[in-house]
């Protein structure tokens, strides 16, 4: 039952001026607190900016006001044009649906009250269901678009990462293959070391070869077999080099043929031609990678160290090392193992070794006046000092210093890999580590610097030598008297001649007294 007009008027008349508010209800004061906070914040901001000077807009902001200027400045700030249907999908049709719903509501407003109430309830239920359907559809469409964008970006990132990993993997594989190839070459060089040492013992002259071949008939047969095998090996090496240089695009001489049978002179000529072609390619490759490494490490930017040998290009370092060819050849002629070829002394005595005589003559002319009392061929470090100086022998080949450097590099490399746990054999790694530690260990006394300790060396005892033992030699009385007189600052005359003269004078005087014919009797 509806309220009467009198009741409504009484309620309005009795309404208090100040409304009754529940102080425990937080929702009542939310709008008031937010309003007061906003007023306080705005007041604080105005107080903070009260001392600011009025400044107009900058030129850059004015230029960026228009989209045209923005496009002219940089294209990366311009977005792509799109439609709402691409983003929201079916949300665009929701507006038309809502418009039709409002029209239906206006038409149905003239219906009776009961029908209107029932229609309102049914329409509210339908509108709620439709809105929920539209919201779920729009959310699903937005999620689909975002999912596609994320998938696209992840696909691009994975492709980029896969390209980088493939590039890094190819670089690592090439480095591993190069290291493996170098280790194979070094292994071959190690196996050839014994053969090179044995080759230095072979006879030098033809006369010595004839003498050795006469003693044993099998030597001639073995020598011919070895010569044929060496020639075959050299031919295969030349053919391999020709194929490799042709495959790598290195310009080779057209006269060189892979199927040609060559003798010793042809082998030397082919080797020289291949080395000449390879030198240009080697220089270009060294320059390229040297420049890349220096630019990556930043060593080229240091002006103070650019003239050092280490910071120069790799090809310049190689050329500097190969510039002094006579010195390098002389180093290969050093007899580090004291090898003496067969019948070498006989060949030297008979004057068959022309190279050895020329080098010895030049050395004698240079050291003509130095140490004339010491023999020319004497060396105190050698156990046997023969008449022939074999410290430098032009008829041998010994590159022990270079071979030692290669071995040290190999040991260091294996040591580092052993420390990282890469080696497969534990025993080999332990041996290599022990060798490297022995190599790096130095017997240095750290307390012997700045004169804090006397440096001395102990002389080794001489073998098969016994020093003479003194048989109690003593001083004479005269030496003892002279020693003590010298300590006291006195002088004693020990001249025997003067004493004899004085004694003879005394004797003559006594004889003269006896023979004066005057006798005195007591």
From Swiss-Prot:
This is Protein BFR2. It comes from the Eukaryota. It is found in: Nucleus, Nucleolus. Residues 205-282 form a coiled coil. The gene is BFR2. Belongs to the AATF family. It comes from Candida glabrata (strain ATCC 2001 / BCRC 20586 / JCM 3761 / NBRC 0622 / NRRL Y-65 / CBS 138). InterPro entries: AATF, AATF/Bfr2, AATF_C. GO terms for biological process: maturation of SSU-rRNA from tricistronic rRNA transcript (SSU-rRNA, 5.8S rRNA, LSU-rRNA). The keyword Coiled coil applies. Residues 26-35, 58-75, 376-385, 512-522 have a biased composition (Basic and acidic residues). Residues 100-110, 118-133, 496-511 have a biased composition (Acidic residues).
